Regions:
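A generic structural signal for ordered secondary structure
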Residues: 53, 92, 179-183
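Alpha-helical ds-nucleic-acid-binding substructure associated with the helix-hairpin-helix region
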Residues: 55-126
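C-terminal accessory module of base-excision DNA glycosylases/AP lyases that mediates lesion recognition
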Residues: 1-22, 85, 100-118, 123-210
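Structure-specific DNA junction-binding interface
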Residues: 1-78, 84
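Short, hydrophobic/amphipathic alpha-helical patches that form generic packing surfaces
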Residues: 34-43, 89-93, 139, 198-205
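Short alpha-helix boundary/capping elements
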Residues: 40-48, 60-61, 96, 145, ...
């Protein structure tokens, strides 16, 4: 694992800088695109999420769910071409009413970063997230300190004995518990916590994506 980090460190740090740039330079529309990507990725894959965003990008701000479904089906981009667009539009409607789509300002309104993640994961009108994808979204817009405990990361942690089971955590309490175990593990092996998440993911997928 340390050797993998050493071999991919340059690529991983480049990717993390790209995430930082999304927050420093990106518009609210860009932040919304990243959130939509994470909604598409949930229950699917990172690659499927990327392909889906590419297929519906012109529709993300104003398109309806039916138009998104047509675009996804035409591109063969997603396994849930009807449900995911409904999640996207429903969540977009919520953000319009909650903050006028001013996502940067809304995210900055939280003094506690964990309260911010709790809001994304627990707000019922934010569809299709949960703690993993809320963490994924925050990481992808440059927020540090949140673990993305997907199946790849969980399998790696189980294989090296950090956790007993590779089953993804299903509650907030369990998510925070595993996250703390990952933080301690990163400290023990001398690898930056945010970099380690991408190391583990790349060990199972063979690439450093997002």
């Amino acid at each position: 694992m340390v050797a993998t980090h050493r071999a991919r460190r340059k690529e991983i740090r480049k990717r993390l800088r790209e995430f930082d740039d999304v927050w420093r330079k990106g518009s609210d529309a860009r932040l919304w695109e990243e959130l939509a990507y994470c909604i598409f990725t949930a229950g699917a894959s990172a690659r499927m999420g990327l392909n889906s965003v590419e297929a519906v990008r012109p529709l993300l701000l104003n398109g309806d769910s039916d138009a998104m479904t047509v675009a996804l089906k035409s591109a063969g981009a997603h396994r849930f071409p009807v449900a995911r667009p409904r999640y996207i539009v429903s969540t977009r409607n919520y953000f319009h009413s909650d903050c006028g789509m001013a996502l940067r300002k809304r995210l900055r309104s939280f003094r506690d970063p964990f309260e911010r993640r709790d809001w994304l994961a627990q707000e019922k009108q934010v569809k299709g997230l949960g703690y993993k994808e809320a963490s994924h979204f925050l990481r992808n817009i440059g927020v540090k300190g949140h673990a993305i405990l997907d199946k790849h990361v969980m399998r790696c942690l189980a294989e090296v004995g950090v956790i007993d089971s590779a089953k993804p955590p299903s509650t907030r309490r369990k998510y925070l518990e595993v996250e703390q175990q990952l933080i301690r593990f990163a400290r023990d092996i001398g690898v930056d916590f945010d970099e380690l998440d991408l190391v583990l993911w790349s060990m199972k997928t063979g690439e450093v994506l997002k």
